[in-house]
């Protein structure tokens, strides 16, 4: 799959919650190639600070309009700069990068938390309206603004929060074992905090259900050259940016 280095124009941004924004950019070559699970590397300004590009999972694509969507949390210098860009501003983007999800599941369950719900949104879109169920967890109701983004895509939405402010109190593991037992799912797709992914992968192993994980690592180059994202796989070192970011759970040796 080809990779494009493109100067793209910002279509617009919108606020999702106090620390999270959604941005749409006009990137027709990337939109034509991207598949669920891939990411792009973004340089947010023309000068040298911040020097390195930042990886963002593709959260959606509109091939007809030639646009891609990214969702990000405002937590560092690069994302603070990104939060201030306006319609018509330009960004430098490399992508699409990495390998995407296996799309052969007949009854998929998506499990996510935090920004891990961004690439899963594109996956739900890829399976088509009403063909996925989603289990999402957060610390509080404020973090689960994602329900509005998924409600037109997923058939069933299951919620958990640490404080019990919405859905079931606890983590996604409060609901997952029962869903695996009764839901008839043939594959689980998970992205989010490492402890959550590890717990989900182990639960799927015990239940005999296939599981794919989308790993989140710092990626300086996004091409497998710098090794900043390398980690232990089963029997070999894996480069998250090049070999992944999506892996079958049994391929991951280091969580």
Residue ranges of predicted features:
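Ferredoxin-reductase
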Residues: 2-87
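Structural signal for conserved beta-strand scaffold positions within catalytic alpha/beta enzyme cores
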Residues: 12, 60, 159-161, 213, ...
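Short, surface-exposed secondary-structure boundary micro-motifs
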Residues: 45-47, 96, 234
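Short, Lys/Arg- and Gly-enriched loop/turn segments at beta-strand edges
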Residues: 47-57, 98-106, 241
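FNR/FR-type flavoprotein reductase catalytic core
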Residues: 77-215
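Local cysteine-cluster metal-coordination motifs and their immediate loop/turn environment
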Residues: 194, 216-245
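Short microdomains enriched in Cys/His and/or Lys/Arg
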Residues: 245-255
């Amino acid at each position: 799959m080809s990779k494009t280095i493109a100067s793209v124009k910002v279509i617009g941004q919108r606020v999702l919650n106090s620390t999270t924004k959604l941005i749409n950019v006009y990137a027709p070559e990337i939109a034509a190639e991207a598949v669920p699970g891939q990411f792009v590397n973004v340089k947010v300004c023309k000068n040298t600070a911040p020097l390195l590009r930042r990886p963002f999972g593709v959260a959606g694509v509109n091939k007809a309009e030639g646009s891609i969507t990214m969702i990000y949390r405002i937590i560092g210098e690069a994302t603070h700069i990104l939060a201030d860009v306006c319609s018509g501003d330009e960004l430098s983007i490399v992508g699409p990068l990495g390998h995407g999800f296996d799309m052969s599941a007949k009854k998929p369950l998506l499990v996510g938390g935090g920004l891990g719900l961004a690439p899963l949104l594109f996956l739900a879109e890829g399976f088509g309206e009403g063909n996925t169920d989603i289990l999402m967890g957060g610390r509080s109701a404020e973090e689960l603004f994602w329900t509005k983004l998924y409600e037109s895509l997923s058939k069933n939405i299951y919620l958990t929060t640490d404080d019990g402010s919405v859905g079931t109190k606890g983590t996604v593991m409060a609901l997952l074992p029962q869903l695996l037992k009764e839901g008839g799912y043939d594959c689980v797709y998970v992205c989010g905090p490492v402890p959550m992914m590890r717990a989900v992968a182990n639960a799927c192993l015990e239940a005999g259900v296939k599981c794919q994980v989308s790993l989140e690592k710092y990626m300086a180059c996004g091409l497998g050259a710098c090794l900043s994202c390398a980690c232990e796989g089963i029997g070999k070192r894996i480069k998250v940016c090049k070999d992944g970011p999506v892996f079958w759970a049994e391929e991951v040796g280091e969580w």
